[in-house]
């Protein structure tokens, strides 16, 4: 252990999702990881699971959907962040429901890169959250 010389900094709310599948060829399960940009301050160049910080827009959407999902707003926000980060980093539309195909998922990913928030993407594509998937 080491002495940090004081109190630890406050934790940053974040969410990560671990995605794996059975190998279609019958081999061992496959695990999805992404490589962080080498220019990133934290863990630049590292192989990581999709995920990241819970943004204020995730907390706002979490508040809006908490009652209908039965989740606490904070828990909903963390799950929303996992869905958003997965779409943003991989193009996979996990935790979402509606008419979703690869073309729409890529368009949604591009929109998300521009807006940074999941709620406008849901509205634009007439999608809804299906957090039971995750």
Q: What is each PLM-predicted segment?
A:
Residues 1-134:
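N-terminal leader/linker segments that precede catalytic domains of diphosphate-processing enzymes
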